[in-house]
Amino acid sequence: MADIQLSKYHVSKDIGFLLEPLQDVLPDYFAPWNRLAKSLPDLVASHKFRDAVKEMPLLDSSKLAGYRQKRLAHLQLVLITSGYLWQEGEGGAVQRLPECVAKPLWNVSNDLGLKPVLTYGDVCLTNCRVKGGDIEVMYNLPGGAGTEWFLKVCGLVELTLGKGAQSVQNVLDGAKANDKAKMTSGLTELTTTIGNMQAALAKMNDNLTPDHFYNVLRPFLGGFGGPASPISGGLIYEGVSDAPVTMIGGSAAQSSAMQLLDNLLGVTHSPDKQAFLDEISNYMIPAHKQLLADLTKMPRKVPQIVAEAKDANLSKAYSGCVAALTQYRTYHIQVVTKYIVTASKSDSPKSLAYKDTGKSDLIPFLKEVRDDTEKMQK
């Protein structure tokens, strides 16, 4: 069996998929990016952000040094893009991105294998810095404390998984060595981790209202292209190409966490649901996407090992872990209902990720994925 080590995929056994601590600003040459990204909320509120972007010089992204600087640059540039596009709301969106943003964003994206659009990997995994065991949000989108809380809670969920990453590694190592005791221990610990992730997600209710998420923050997570998008024809990246580009918006569906747990536990989905999840994975950090792919290639999957072992303790640990993941997904449906479905006051509510791909059946989709998980207990 292939030896899968999380550390080879930019996954830390302390903070999981979050990026290891880095400086919150780029070198002085990139001061215009630093300044605009930091001042985005205030400049958008005063309707001066677009003008400030137009005055920004075209900087040479090849002066960025190393992976972490490029990740930070990508975060800054997609935030600047978001502020520029959505400063006047969905009704006032523009269809062209100035070259001073578009060209370096395109180049940095190519260097990293990322999409040139705001993703979960940017606003959460790069943007949320672990400090003193807590999450510090480096850059905020419009909306003040409510928006910052949303980003922080996303980071807390990821950090909680990160603290349990060793249990994931133990399951993988146990599966490779056919070590039933190690697998049992890993699955038991992972069950606790998933429960803790649900508790972290529940903190969303403390300082974020549905109205704030849906009407203040959500538009700035938007993608472009397609009949449901305010930028229906796609976005033109000036200085790159005159052909409009279509991208889906930032969404927690782009987190690798749930697909990691699915692939580890052997949860499978119907072809149409898997096709959407595969499309979403194209918006993940490439190393994280590769981890998910490598997990699916394991010659002997965890459910098979559990079934063949006929070990009561291992079976109980596996079933408990699947039950915890099922419960997490049930709670996540409640969160989505509160912050998207109810807040939208629409007969066919859509999250932006689903809008941009033409899917309007958000809640049925999530319920089917939850049910796919629950079936693994039988």
Curated annotation (Swiss-Prot):
The cofactor binding remark recorded in the entry reads: Binds 1 heme group per subunit.
Its domain of life? Eukaryota
Extract the Pfam families matched here.
IDO (PF01231)
Residue list for modification Blocked amino end (Ala): 2
| Residues binding heme, per UniProt | 332
Q: Any keyword Transport?
A: yes
Q: From the record, give the cysteines joined by S-S bonds.
A: none
In its UniProt record, which GO terms are filed under biological process?
A: 'de novo' NAD biosynthetic process from L-tryptophan; L-tryptophan catabolic process to kynurenine
GO function terms (MF aspect): heme binding; indoleamine 2,3-dioxygenase activity; metal ion binding; oxygen carrier activity; tryptophan 2,3-dioxygenase activity
GO CC field: cytoplasm
> By its UniProt entry, which InterPro entries does this protein fall under?
Indolamine_dOase (IPR000898), Trp/Indoleamine_2_3_dOase-like (IPR037217)
Keywords linked to the UniProt accession: Heme, Iron, Metal-binding, Oxygen transport, Transport
Q: Which cofactor does it need?
A: heme
Subunit organization = Homodimer.
Q: Any idea what job this protein has?
A: Serves a reserve supply of oxygen and facilitates the movement of oxygen within muscles.
What extra comment accompanies this record? Answer: In the presence of tryptophan, the autoxidation rate of the protein is greatly accelerated (25 times).
Protein family: Belongs to the indoleamine 2,3-dioxygenase family.
What is the protein name given in its UniProt record?
A: Myoglobin
* Source species of the chain: Haliotis diversicolor (Abalone)
